[in-house]
Amino acid sequence: MECTPEFWRANLELWKILDVDYNSDFNDTFGSDYFEPNITLEQAINLEGPGLNHLARSGVAAYLDSIVNPYTDVEILRESVHDNNIHALDAFVSLYSENMNK
């Protein structure tokens, strides 16, 4: 299952089922220090635009997707976001999508 940031932002009640608090700190979740002041996972998934906002929004959606799919390596995902590597994150999401469609 690959869900969009739009899906996850519209279904905050599902985060609780996954045992994810949408008020959790983005920087703590991904071991990064991108946002000052800190933002929550919910704020991150609601960000608009390219660059770091895209990384944060897509990273949170992929993180939630990775909890749904037990075959996903959450650490690779976290490292991609931590390293601000949007290309690695995009590759991760593409590979994840291919595996889910098999």
Predicted stretch roles:
Residues 1-102:
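Soluble extracellular-acting proteins and domains
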